[in-house]
Regions:
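Active-site neighborhoods of divalent-metal-dependent phosphate/nucleic-acid chemistry enzymes
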Residues: 2-3, 89-147, 171
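Residues at the C-termini of beta-strands that transition into short coil/loop
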Residues: 65, 95, 167-168
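A short helix-to-beta-strand connector/capping loop
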Residues: 57, 87-89, 158-162
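Short secondary-structure boundary segments
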Residues: 25, 65, 136-138
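C-terminal end-helix/capping segment
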Residues: 142-163
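Short, well-structured N-terminal submotif of metal-dependent ribonuclease cores
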Residues: 1-63, 70-81, 89, 107-113, ...
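Short, C-terminally biased terminal segments at protein or domain edges
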Residues: 159-173
Length: 173
């Protein structure tokens, strides 16, 4: 095997081995929002920017139509910034199985009606067998309760559970 073939094969292997990350809409929102006066939110915004610049190039990052739906809401100028930030991210498909799984999560995780799309984000990441689901939603997605219950539910369904984490928890891949 020539050196060029080895190098090509190594690069192909590296590409194939990149971790996959589903970015829930809070990631895009924190990335593009004007700096907050709230110290915790401002820190999350800064961590998100660092993650976007340093880690995102090392992973295969995805969003879904649900993310596009959420980032398109609200103030038109802010929504446009979010849409622009997400425009080059691959969008995972949605199908009936994902919708059914989202409904199951919605009920079993006791997610409030106003946060129904949080169950959809979980279902997309699970169905597509994504490695990490990245979010700043620490109530209905990245919470100890949800992590535990989701693993239990998915074990009974024979489904792989992604690692649910914040950008701060995924600074290295």
């Amino acid at each position: 095997m020539t050196q060029a073939n080895k190098t090509f094969q190594q690069k192909m292997l590296e590409i194939a081995m990149k971790p996959t990350v589903y970015m829930e809409s809070t990631i895009i929102s924190y990335l593009t929002a004007r700096p907050s006066r709230d110290l915790i939110v401002a820190a999350h915004q800064q961590i998100t920017v660092e993650w976007w610049e340093d880690v995102r190039p090392k992973v295969d990052a995805f969003i879904s139509p649900f993310v596009n739906q959420e980032i398109s809401r609200g103030d038109e100028k802010a929504a446009q910034k979010r849409i622009e930030a997400a425009k080059n991210l691959p969008v995972l498909e949605i199908n009936d199985e994902i919708q059914k799984l989202a409904e199951k999560y919605f009920v079993m995780l006791e997610i409030p009606e106003k946060s129904r799309l949080d169950a959809a984000h979980l279902a997309v990441a699970v169905w597509h067998e994504i490695d990490y689901l990245l979010s700043w939603n620490c109530r209905h997605i990245v919470s100890g309760r949800v992590k535990k219950l989701l693993e239990e539910i998915n074990a009974t369904l024979n489904l792989k559970t992604p690692v649910l984490c914040t950008p701060e928890e995924l600074m290295e891949v």
